[in-house]
Amino acid sequence: MGTKDRILIIDFSNYEDFPIGGYLTFARNMISSFGSDLALAGITTSRNDPVGRWFKKKINNVEFDFFAMARYDSTKTKKIIPDRLVNYLLIKYYRKRILDIGINNIFLQRQESLLALSDCKRNICYSFAGLDNPLVNSKYSYGGLMAHWFEDRFFKKIGVASLILGRGDEKAIQNMLLRSNGSMAGREVIKFPTRIDTTIFKPCDRDKARLKLNLPEGAFIVLTTGRLAWWKGWKFMIDSFMEFLKQSHNALFIMVGEGEDYDKIKLYISENKLADKILLTGKKGGEEIASYLNASDLYIMGSYKEGWPTALMEAVACGVPVCATDFSSVDEIIIEGVNGYIIRDRDEQQFAKGMLKAAQLQKPVKNDHVTRYSTDRLKEDILNHWQLI
């Protein structure tokens, strides 16, 4: 890839470990696939990085052109001002300096990023991380009030993108197109599943994984991974696990991840006297997450909404049986009775029954339908759709 064909990613992350979630995961997959052919604009959590100018930064021993729009404290998960608003204002403020690098191809995956760059006249690839309106279930009380206005404004500007990708199933894509009220008429949204690193997320010996993590050999381990936020359904999963415990007394529920609801979850565990039955591990890296997955007997996900969930893909890639609620793309990942079960109603007793059924499935479960979406093919798949200039 020549100099003129480089790609600039602008995203509200440090491209290493903050903030956790699907945006960061996909950005890191892009880094893994494209390497230093990328230039990165985002935020930094390092005191050593300059802010407001381009500099050279090493990530995973690869040197990148990097532009830090702001410095963040990664230990603070509760913020007064929404990240989306901060991201929009930062891109607007630093826009000229960011674009001065002279790269024509820009990859975006956040709505507010596109709004801030809607008149930049560059070759934009916009990738929907999820197909729902992100403000409908905002943790900020005023977010819902602005949801329709925000999405309407976004739909009117998305026409500037040369290519539009959607990390969701066909139903979610069609629902999104209907919500655009004709603003996206005639535009193709290409279904583009999230990617996983199959060199890390693959079936491995359960006992060795437990020994490595110092986990009890005889316990039935239930696992969930990802951001600890209300829309991930942590309360529903804990309540369902309490029902599951009535039938599986030796069960242990491990929640891997961090997020704004960590303290709430810890308190809820204490109130229900589950401290010896539920383990909060905090943030873990990819290889350690893979070890937890391989050490587990069952993976659960209780989300209210998802795009194309990387965490669920990683679990299936490791051959772990799963039980999940109903959300976009779940039918493309879970094959009922083969690698897991989908519980359509948010009923804790029904979900616990689904967990019991999934627990009977033999490991490793079928996973070839998700391992085909490996990061090894990400670069080729994107460039098959996106003509760089």
PLM feature spans:
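Aromatic "clamp/platform" in nucleotide-sugar-dependent glycosyltransferases that forms part
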Residues: Y304
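Active-site proximal beta-strand in glycosyltransferases
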Residues: N105-F107, L117-S138, G144, S162-L163
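Conserved donor-binding/catalytic core segment of Leloir-type glycosyltransferases
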Residues: P216-K232, I238-F241
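N-terminal strand-loop element at the rim of the active site
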Residues: D11-F18, S33-I81
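Short hydrophobic beta-strand element within catalytic cores of glycosyltransferases
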Residues: P321-A324
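Nucleotide-activated donor-binding/catalytic signature segment of Leloir-type glycosyltransferases, i.e.
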Residues: K266-K284
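Membrane-proximal helix-turn-helix segments that form the acceptor-binding/catalytic region
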Residues: K96, G144-L165, G182
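Conserved acidic donor-binding segment of nucleotide-sugar-dependent glycosyltransferases
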Residues: E336-G337, Y341-E348, L356-L361
